[in-house]
Amino acid sequence: LKIKRNESFRYHFDEPITGEFYLVKEGRRTPAGLMEIHNISPSGIAIATPLKLPIDRSTSIVVEFSLLLGSEPLNVSGQILHEKWTEAQRLYGVRLDTTKEDQQRIIEAIKQIVKEKP
């Protein structure tokens, strides 16, 4: 399994950020599940959840999260690319289908997070 983590820009969070996700397959949506975001780039995200998620091309994942307190949540769909076990959770790599605007919002939020770090 080849994991592409050599993107130009990926931010690793000291403390994971929580968010929600749901899966869509053949137009049907699953109930929302909780996730923790461990790292993010403008076009990808690593999430952890105790749930077993399917890794197949016919299922898309929709993630919703706010990188900054009080900011409008981002709602982006994507594809689960790989799975890795960590302690009691599964870590999933997700390729996000981001627009240029989504990518810009992610970059600006990360810049703000870095600036506010002690």
Regions found by a protein language model. Give the residues of each.
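Residue-level preference for beta-strand/loop junctions
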Residues: 13, 29, 57-59, 72, ...
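Short conserved beta-strand and strand-loop elements enriched in small hydrophobics
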Residues: 17-24, 58-73
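Short strand-loop-strand
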Residues: 25-58, 62, 93-95
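Short beta-strand-centered aromatic/proline hotspots
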Residues: 35, 76-81
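Short solvent-exposed strand/turn elements
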Residues: 51-55, 91-111
